[in-house]
Regions:
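Transmembrane helix-loop-helix hairpins at the membrane interface
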Residues: 1-30, 46-57, 62-66, 71-82, ...
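Alpha-helical transmembrane segments in multi-pass membrane proteins
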Residues: 2-5, 54-100, 122-195
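Intrinsically disordered, low-complexity acidic/Q/S/K-rich activation/interaction tracts characteristic
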Residues: 6, 10-15, 44, 116-119, ...
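Membrane-water interface of transmembrane alpha-helices
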Residues: 11-20, 93-115, 186-197
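Interfacial transmembrane-helix boundary/kink motif in multi-pass membrane proteins
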Residues: 25-42, 81-91, 111-140, 161-178, ...
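Transmembrane alpha-helix boundary signature
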Residues: 51-54, 107-113, 146-147
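Intrinsic disorder/low-complexity segments enriched in polar/charged and small flexible residues
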Residues: 94-97, 177, 208, 356, ...
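Helix N-terminus capping/helix-initiation residues
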Residues: 104-108, 196, 211, 259, ...
Length: 390
């Protein structure tokens, strides 16, 4: 619920920016820019403190009260590894905040307007750029933590890592995040502030027309691309998958274990939320390439690997569907792409549960037909090797 409230708050800020842009007096836009500058200055100071203040005594205190199920020594090692990434996170936070403050000046926005279709004079477009920076910041935060988690797994003892991840991975949490994306998209395009519900749906590409040609082409292309990257990754870099496979199993195992509900959540929630926000709201302003790059960036929970290449390719495919058809067609293609492989995971195959990314080995007691499964390192199963997007 917290992430839903946070995303909705950003959407409301963009809605107020729509009102400020419609005022004849520019003082409202200046006031909005001043508030944004103050907020980003606070964020920059917090990042600087995180980068320079030592956190030596925290692992003992946090590990003692975490109740993660691991032995105290392993829990302490886990938190030492996680906290070791905080200076990097602080540095990223500081520099992202500096970039955001610079974007409050007219000339950087005018330069960007030559690359992407934004209006450098509109406050709402400035906030949209800041929203993109927030996505980059949280993605960097996730990437650094994932690298720390992988180092723990490589040491051979998860130290309560599985408990820590599983407690934050629920069907309800995934739906809350994706519904937050929907709320952010609608408020971001000015629902109730600058557009009626019908106008907002039209702006987001929620139109009745449905292109079966683009739908089927996107699903087939996405699945084919996923299998191709999986084969290449298995053959060229098999060792790089081991830790990500284990981490992915921890992330998605609790959702997959819920059966059909989990499969539908993985399939439908991301199709609804991610397509509405990225292809519906962002793409008309940021363009296909920049939006697809942002889409790949938010999936850094899989680490910096070939997974991101596959996610970028899938994003470009869905972006073309949005451009040539509409968002609902892209949404259906995304949901189908996810659902195919989420269902395969539920019924027992060894399944890459990401946009063409790492294989999630399903535990033996989940497998319906374990004899039909081929090791992801040994090769691709003859019938199917599913992938799905979280």
């Amino acid at each position: 619920m917290g992430i839903f409230i946070g995303l909705t708050f950003i959407g409301l800020a963009m809605g107020l920016a729509h009102i400020a842009d419609r005022q004849a007096d520019a003082v409202w836009r200046y006031l909005g820019s001043f508030v944004l500058a103050a907020l980003w200055l606070i964020i920059a100071l917090c990042g600087m403190m995180l980068a320079v203040v030592p956190l030596v005594d925290l692992p003992d205190n946090i590990a003692a009260g975490a109740n993660l199920g691991g032995d105290p020594g392993s829990n302490q090692a886990l938190f030492e590894s996680l906290l070791s990434s905080f200076p990097k996170i602080g540095a990223w936070t500081f520099w992202v905040a500096i970039v955001a403050i610079l974007l409050l000046l007219p000339w950087p926005r005018r330069l960007l307007a030559r690359l992407i279709p934004i209006d450098p004079e509109r406050l709402v477009h400035t906030i949209a750029l800041h929203g993109a920076l927030v996505l980059v910041l949280f993605s960097a935060f996730t990437a650094f933590l994932v690298q720390s988690m992988l180092s723990v797994l490589e040491a051979g003892d998860d130290g309560g890592l599985q408990t820590l991840i599983e407690d934050g991975t629920t069907v309800g949490g995934l739906w809350a995040q994706q519904l937050g994306f929907v709320a952010l998209a609608f408020l971001g395009v000015g629902l109730f502030f600058a557009r009626t519900p019908v106008e907002a749906m039209r702006r987001l590409g929620w139109t009745r027309a449905f292109s079966w040609r683009w739908y089927l082409g996107a699903v087939a292309s996405g699945v084919g691309m996923a299998l191709l990257v999986q084969v290449v990754w298995n053959r060229l870099l098999p060792d790089s998958q081991a830790g990500i496979e284990q981490l992915s199993e921890m992330m998605f195992g609790p959702i997959v274990k819920t059966g059909l509900v989990g499969a539908l959540t993985i399939g439908l929630a991301a199709g609804l939320g991610e397509e509405t926000l990225f292809r519906g709201a962002m793409q008309p302003r940021f363009g296909i390439v920049f939006t697809s790059m942002l889409f790949a960036v938010i999936h850094t929970q899989y680490g910096v690997s070939l997974a991101l290449v596959q996610i970028l390719a899938i994003a470009l495919i869905f972006g073309l569907v949005r451009q040539r058809a509409n968002t609902l067609t892209a949404m259906a293609a995304h949901a189908t792409y996810n659902l195919i492989f989420a269902l395969a995971a539920v019924i027992g195959s060894q399944t890459p549960l990401w946009h063409g990314g790492p294989v999630v080995p399903i535990p033996e007691d989940w497998k319906a037909t374990p004899t039909a499964v081929v090791s992801p390192v040994d090769g691709i199963p003859p019938a199917m090797t599913p992938t799905a997007a979280p």
